[in-house]
Regions:
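Glycine-centered coil/turn sites that cap beta-strands in beta-rich domains
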Residues: 62-80, 84-105, 114-117, 126, ...
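Short, compositionally biased serine/threonine- and acidic-rich segments at solvent-exposed termini, linkers
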Residues: 26-69
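Short beta-strand edge segments in extracellular beta-sheet folds
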Residues: 159-163
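Generic structural signal for well-ordered beta-strand positions
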Residues: 29, 112-113, 139
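Extracellular and select intracellular beta-sandwich modules with Ser/Thr-enriched
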Residues: 153-157
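Short, surface-exposed loop/turn motifs with a glycine/proline- and acidic-biased composition
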Residues: 97, 116-151
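Proteolytic processing hotspots in large secreted/extracellular or virion-associated proteins
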Residues: 1-14
Length: 163
């Protein structure tokens, strides 16, 4: 295990606030000079934290901005436009950095193409599907499904391609 403990040599000005934001857990340790963060290195090979120091009003504003950029849960939004021809946008949210897959399937459940596959940083993301399959061929009109999967999460949305 690895742990962080905040301290300052010789004390610090009374108006200074030191706050740590534990990104993966959306946890805020407001007075980090008195706090401690434990990280299990067997589970985490990398870990995102942010430390903010300054006057209280500045620290509060920065923490709010940081947390606003971190989704609370995985989600897959409905594509837009829908119906589409031939291009559509797909937005999705990733609350924790890690492996994510976003794939397109046809009405028979066959994978048509994979738009995203690999490690993604936490945040709000967008990808464009141009109506092409994995081989670069234009797919026919019809119903398709976008599916986001990550860490046991799976969500599917129905899309309609009209030509």
């Amino acid at each position: 295990p690895l742990y962080f403990k905040g301290s300052m040599l010789g004390g610090y000005p009374r108006e200074l606030q030191v706050t740590l934001v534990d990104i993966p857990n959306r946890n805020v340790i407001e007075d980090f000079t008195q706090g401690r963060l434990d990280i299990d290195t067997k589970i985490n090979s990398s870990y995102d934290i942010k430390i903010i120091a300054g006057e209280r009003s500045y620290v509060v504003q920065m923490v709010e901005e940081i947390l606003a950029d971190i989704p609370e849960q995985y989600s897959l939004s409905q594509n837009y436009p829908n119906p589409f021809n031939p291009i559509t946008n797909i937005n999705y949210s990733v609350p924790r950095s890690g492996s994510v897959t976003l794939a397109i399937y046809n009405i028979m459940g066959q994978r048509v193409t994979t738009l995203v596959s690999g490690n993604m940083k936490y945040g709000y993301h967008s990808v464009v599907w141009n109506g092409l399959d994995q081989s670069g061929r234009q797919v026919s009109s019809g119903v398709y499904f976008s599916e986001l999967s990550a860490r046991g999460f799976r969500q599917t949305k129905k899309m309609l391609l009209l030509k």
